[in-house]
Amino acid sequence: RYIEIAAAAAARTPRAGDLFFQPLYNNRTVDNPVPERIYAAELNCRLTGPVVDFQAAFFAAMTLDGIETRTYYDDMASVYCDMAVTGVGRMSCGAEAAADIRLSYRWLLSLAASAGCYEYIRDPRVTVLSDVDNSAVDVQAVSRMGGCETGGAPQLTALAEIAWFGPKGWGCRASAGYAGRRYVEPMPLRRTDRIAGQGGITREFFDAFTRQERLPDAFTLDAALFKSFRFERSRLTASLMLRNLTGEADTVYGGYESLRVRRIRPGDDTLYAPHASRCTYAWPRSFYLTISYRF
C-alpha cells in the first residue's frame, strides 16, 4: 500500500495561434496578453491484496488568465469577425476510484467510478473586431461565464467489467458504462450584453442565450472475444470487439453552443434567438477486428 501527494504551480505562454486575432493574414495581436497560470494538487492511494487491488485519487486543478481566439460570422453586426476571449478561469476537482477483484483463477471483476465538478469560475472579457478592417465591434465586454459547466467531460461516471481468461489463450470481456451530468461547451460571446442583453429583449430570450444545455445521460454496453497464440519469445493476439451492443443510435457524444443568431420577425418587430446546440453522436453498433504481435 502507498499514499502519494503531489502539487504543482506553473505559468505558460499562450499558444501562438491565440495571440493573434487572425493568424493567417492579420498581424493584429491580442491586447496585453499574460501567461496562463496553473495550480494543481492530487492525492493518490493504493491498496494491494491477494483478492482485491484498490486505488483512489482526489484532485483539484485551477487555470487562470486563459486566452482563446476564434473567427466567425457575427449575425448581429452582419460581418465576419475575429474574437479574443481573455481572462478565462476554470476549476476542476473530484475523486476517482477503481478496484480489480479476482473472483477466481479465471474470472476478474473490474469496477471504476468518478465524481467531479468542472466549471468556469470567472467572467472573461470578450473583444470582437471586424475581419475586414479591424474596426471594433465590441471591446472588453463582460461575459457571464462564471458558474457555467465545462463541456466535454462527464461529471459522473461508472464502469463495470467482467473478464474470463480461459485455457489455450481464449478469453472474453463484457462491460457496461455510464456517463452523467454532461453539458454542451458554453460560448462566451452569447453571454455578453451585446448578444444576450440586446438580443434577449425578453426574459425568455435572455435565458435562451445564457442558459447552458445539459446533455442526456449515456449508457454503453460492450463485449470482446480474444485468442492469444504464444510462441517462444513472442505472442500473437486476435480480438473481436463489439461496441454499443444495444444499437442505440441517438446517444449524444458531446456538443457545443452555436455562435450564430436567428432573426425572428413577427410582424414589424425583430427578435433574436440562439441557434440550437451542435451535437455529435456516438457510433451505432460497431465491430472491430484487431491483430497485435508482441516480441
Predicted features and spans:
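Repeated loop/turn-to-beta-strand initiation elements of outer-membrane beta-barrel proteins
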Residues: R1-I3, V51-F54, R106-L109, K168-C172, ...
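Outer-membrane beta-barrel signature, preferentially recognizing the C-terminal barrel domain
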Residues: Y2, A9-L64, D74-L103, E149-L156, ...
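A general secondary-structure boundary signal
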Residues: Y2, C45, Y120, W164-G171, ...
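Structural signature of outer-membrane beta-barrel domains
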Residues: A8-P14, F21, P50-V52, A61-D65, ...
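C-terminal beta-signal and adjacent terminal beta-strands/loops
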Residues: A11, Y178-A196, K227-F295
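Solvent-exposed loop segments that connect transmembrane elements
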Residues: G17-T29, E68-M83, R122-G146, P186-F209, ...
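Gram-negative outer-membrane beta-barrel transporters
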Residues: D53, F58-M62, Y80-P188, S292-R294
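C-terminal beta-barrel architecture of Gram-negative outer-membrane proteins
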Residues: G151-R230, G254-G255
